[in-house]
UniProtKB/Swiss-Prot annotation, chain C:
Name assigned to this protein: Dipeptide transport ATP-binding protein DppD
Binding site for [4Fe-4S] cluster: 285, 291, 298, 316
GO terms, molecular function: 4 iron, 4 sulfur cluster binding; ATP binding; ATP hydrolysis activity; metal ion binding
Residues making up the signal peptide according to the UniProt record: none
The organism of origin for this protein: Caldanaerobacter subterraneus subsp. tengcongensis (strain DSM 15242 / JCM 11007 / NBRC 100824 / MB4)
Reaction(s) the record says it catalyses: a dipeptide(out) + ATP + H2O = a dipeptide(in) + ADP + phosphate + H(+)
Keyword Transport: yes
Family under the similarity heading: Belongs to the ABC transporter superfamily.
Topology versus the membrane: Peripheral membrane protein
């Protein structure tokens, strides 16, 4: 238990450092914190820089006479109360945007993770059992080719092939603009159809990496002495394959599963942007594009919280399922 | 003497890579792109003037990869863009390895509070989701018109941490090994121990990691360019992709397929070359690394 | 006593990149029922290969080239896999050398007992299983309540070795084969295990075969000793006779080397030279390069496996020529 308390404290420190880092980065740029935004506004609206700077100050809620320290204390204080800040671009609180976007992101990543993990584990174990045979070479080569495709590039390909060329999938969004959200079957069907693109773009690269890790782990476990001893005891191959090989090979992967979900919260910025899928990543991309630093810091805080919670959960899960860790 | 050590270097590090199938193919792919970046622009001229009469031409002898929305030859752009793609990727990998090695070795050697502080820094960079953080950093610096070296540094900041962690662990374990103990007992200076004993064992490690960084560096830099966050070269493939999708709308017209396809093909092939080489390097050198543990 | 296992001209090799390792080269051996047989040899002399080939549990790169292993008149080597699986563990149990890594780290000890029983179609209720497992664990001097619900990493090296023995005894096998039961253990634990095997031998009607590099262990436990050198069986005799009157020059060297440990250091007579490479073994008698009695014929011809008076068997030209060691 002591271990977990330590770990939690440690992750909290990491959180504070990370968030403070971003705050300092955004707010304490050489010169004026609103400089970047002001340049952007001046370009966009074709106005004088001084005028733009004034607008930028207002938009960011900065009083130029207030010290950075005061602002930092305010910001952290708000964060502690669960207030993620204010978006100047959307003219609403970041909390409201999170409430709107988070369900979509969670929906996509949980489905994508579930699909990629189950298929990847199966394929990896299968390839390892057939090590050196053609089917193994095929699976591993395909998997490493897929790994060479960044998810957002895959998203572009999927969008082009399935949406533009063959018109099988919608061009973007989470559901048709002309539909009112409801619990009707047709609406749910549309929601699923809109999610296919983002899910594929996230799941396929994931699947490749699960496959490769599972293949490596399985091959390693197959060399272990306890496998030979199980064979000597006359256990059936199916029992050895599941209880001895698969269970041991899978353990480390189950833990990374939790961490993976945490990282995907913010890691799918480009994929969601390409599909115009209104999740956290989409708003993050938008915040970058329009230099909405309030929204940016708020969403980033959420992403870091997600990663930290996931890391903690992963530790916990690992300790729960692996006696080697549990007993230490 | 020099000749002898060069020969040894060839047999120890180069020849095994030419024998391994994966690293050989990876090397061929990377060499192809490096040639494209160095010699290519000298042979292939770049003409960026718009010629709407030739918009979206299919690949032909005249235009091997076809033309884009503005009627500009895509092949020429790819060749000229490879220069900034390769230099950005290599520089970013180099910086990442440099930062990771320096911090990792420092962590391995420094004990007490300083060591723990470095640990915490490494941990922070390990935990923070790197791509969103990179985007924020890039957005903050966007209006400063960064050059290749500066962008490479921005990317490298988010790549070095895993390497630093591995190296610090290696140094810590090497530190306790007998021969380091021995050089301490023989009263040799710390500097000597550091460079002679440890550096020797870390070289293959650093080499492997440089190659392994290529994938991350490529993905990050192309992603940055794709979002239009660093625009120093209009023919960088990430920026080409950005133009193709958002300026020219090539994504939404079936005629533009070859435009997107050839950009993507080159990006993926280059990353795949890096992956193959790193898999090969790992296969060749890792047993040796494990032997050192 | 009757013969329970008869090994005839067993040949097994390992395929490695550099060639084939001729690890067991024409082994013939009779194992007597309810006896304890020690197979003694230096490391990499092929002694483990013999028992692994006998039970068809060689690692993937191992191949059996020829020979027969007759158990109750049936050849284990040509038996169908299904039939062999039934005999394995139920009648012939093998405790491997790597005792420390032989249990599944993610399974409790009890589950190992459970799946072993299930694999052999034995229908025991859970309480029966616990009862039987506890009985065997007590037999190896372990506390069943504590051990059964432990994970392997909670056990010490000696405890793991005992769990493997208990596991091997679970289905009351006729033959128990142990590969280096005392290696990788500290001296005290080694003594415990030897003591334990002695007790088992008294307690149970069982045939024990064990492999060891330590001839002292053989002296303490075995009724009969088989000496292996470079993949060949060189001598086979009752323990008493082997120590009293070693026939083969190699056996004599082995025994001299242990006598020296607790005797006068000046009389230490280690065998000069190195163990042979099994990739390219020496011609003729594989011991000839290290043998002080080597003759011309030893370099050319492989000595025959001959039976002398009593139980004594030896492979040495000295005896074929009728010039025994004095």
């Amino acid at each position: 238990m002591n271990y977990f308390v330590n770990r939690l404290l440690y992750l909290l420190v990491v959180f504070v450092i990370a968030i403070s880092g971003v705050f300092v980065l955004v707010n304490n740029m050489p010169g004026d914190p609103a400089y970047g935004l002001a340049v952007y506004i001046a370009q966009q609206r074709n106005m004088q820089f001084e005028q733009a700077l004034e607008i930028a100050h207002k938009m960011m809620g900065i009083d130029p006479h207030e010290s950075v320290v005061t602002r930092y204390v305010k910001f952290m204080n708000n964060l502690l109360r669960g207030n993620f800040g204010y978006s100047t671009f959307y003219n609403t609180s970041v909390n409201e945007i999170i409430a709107r976007a988070l369900p979509w992101t969670l929906f996509v990543i949980s489905l994508a993770t579930f699909i990629s993990f189950s298929i990847g584990i199966y394929l990896g174990a299968f390839a390892a059992q057939k090590r050196g045979k053609t089917i193994d070479t095929l699976i591993s080569t395909l998997a490493s080719i897929i790994q060479a495709i960044p998810p957002f590039i895959l998203a572009v390909l999927i969008l082009f092939v399935f949406s533009v060329r063959f018109r099988l999938l919608p061009l973007g969004g989470a559901y048709p603009v002309d539909m009112e959200p409801s619990l009707s079957i047709s609406f749910i069907g549309k929601v699923l159809l809109h999610a296919v693109g983002p899910i594929l773009a996230v799941a396929i690269p994931q699947m490749a990496s699960w496959t490769l890790s599972m293949r490596g782990n399985t091959a390693q476990v197959m060399e272990e002495d306890f496998i030979r001893f199980a064979e000597m005891r006359g256990l059936a191959d199916s029992v050895i394959a599941s209880k001895y090989i698969r269970n041991n090979a899978m353990l480390p992967l189950v833990a990374s599963l939790a961490i993976g979900i945490g990282y995907m919260l913010g890691g799918q910025t480009l994929v969601e942007s390409i599909f115009n899928y209104p999740g956290i990543g989409f708003y993050f991309g938008k915040a970058i594009a329009v230099r909405d630093f309030g929204l940016l810091t708020g969403l980033f805080s959420l992403i870091v919280i997600g990663v930290i919670v996931a890391t903690f959960v992963a530790d916990f899960v690992y300790a729960l399922i692996d006696p080697r860790v549990k007993l230490k | 003497m020099r000749k002898e050590s060069l020969k040894n270097f060839y047999y120890d590090y180069i020849q095994p890579l030419l024998v391994n199938k994966k690293s050989l193919i990876g090397l061929i792919i990377l060499t192809f792109f490096i040639l494209m970046a160095t010699v290519g622009p000298l042979i292939v001229p770049l003409d960026m003037t718009s010629n709407f009469a030739e918009r979206y031409q299919k690949p032909s002898l005249k235009h091997p990869f076809g033309t884009d929305y503005f009627g500009v030859d895509i092949f020429q752009q790819i060749v000229h863009g490879s220069r900034s793609v390769i230099s950005l990727t290599m520089l970013a990998s180099f910086f990442a390895v440099l930062i990771g090695t320096v911090i990792g070795v420092a962590r391995g050697y420094l004990e007490g509070i300083v060591g723990r502080a470095i640990d915490a820094i490494i941990m922070v960079f390990l935990v923070i989701p790197s791509f969103p953080a990179l985007l924020i950093l890039a957005a903050v610096f966007m209006n400063y018109n960064l050059n290749v070296v500066e962008i490479a540094l921005l990317v490298a900041v988010w790549l070095w941490a895993p390497l630093a962690k591995q190296i610090s662990a290696q140094v810590l374990s090497l530190k306790s090994k007998e021969f380091v103990e021995a050089s301490k007992m023989l009263n040799m200076p710390l500097r000597y121990i550091l460079f002679s004993d440890i550096a020797k064992l870390l070289i293959p490690y650093i080499f492997i990691n440089f190659v392994m960084q290529i994938k991350g560096a490529m993905e990050f830099s192309v992603g940055l360019m794709f979002l239009g966050l660093a625009k120093f070269d209009p023919t960088h493939w990430g920026i080409m992709l950005n133009y193709a999708l958002y300026q020219a709308g090539a994504l939404y017209t079936a005629k533009g397929f070859h435009y997107i396809f050839f950009i993507i093909l080159n990006i993926v092939l280059l990353i795949y070359g890096g992956i193959l080489l790193s898999q090969g390097v790992e296969e060749v050198f890792n047993p040796r690394l494990r032997g050192n543990e | 006593m009757s013969i329970i296992i008869r090994v005839e001209d067993l040949r097994a090799v390992y395929l490695v990149r550099e060639g084939t390792i001729k690890a067991a080269d024409g082994i013939s051996l009779d194992i007597l029922e309810n006896s304890v047989t020690a197979i003694v040899g230096e490391s990499a002399s092929g002694k483990s290969t013999i028992i692994e080939a006998m039970t068809k549990t060689l690692p993937p790169n191992g191949r059996i080239l020829s020979g027969r292993v007759l158990y109750k008149g049936k050849d284990l080597l040509t038996m169908r896999e299904e039939e062999l699986r039934k005999i394995r563990w139920k009648e012939i149990a093998l405790v491997p050398q790597a005792a420390q890594q032989s249990l599944n780290p993610t399974m409790k000890v009890i589950e190992h007992f459970k799946d072993t029983v299930e694999a052999h179609g034995v229908r025991w209720s859970h309480s029966e299983l616990i009862e039987k497992a506890s009985e065997k664990l007590r037999m190896v001097r372990l506390n069943p309540e504590a051990v059964l619900n432990s994970y392997p990493l909670q056990l010490s090296g000696g405890m793991k070795q005992r769990v493997l023995i208990a596991l091997a005894l679970l289905l009351d096998p006729v033959v128990l084969i142990l590969d280096e039961p005392t290696s990788a253990l500290d001296v005290l634990t080694q003594a415990h295990i030897i003591q334990l095997l002695k007790e088992l031998k008294k307690m149970l009607k069982i045939t024990l075969i064990f492999v060891t590099h330590d001839i002292a262990v053989a002296a303490e436990l075995a009724d009969k000793v088989a000496v292996i050198y470079g993949g060949n069986l060189v001598e086979y005799n009752s323990t008493f006779q082997i120590f009293k009157n070693p026939l083969h020059p190699y056996t004599r060297g082995l025994i001299n080397s242990i006598m020296a440990v607790n005797a006068d250091m000046s009389k230490v007579k280690p065998i000069p030279g190195d163990p042979p490479s099994l990739l390219n073994p020496p011609s003729g008698c594989r011991f000839h390069p290290r043998c002080e009695y080597a003759m011309e014929i030893c370099k050319k011809e492989k000595p025959k496996w001959i039976r002398l008076d009593g139980e004594a068997h030896v492979a040495c030209h000295l005896y074929e020529e009728g010039r025994p060691l004095k």
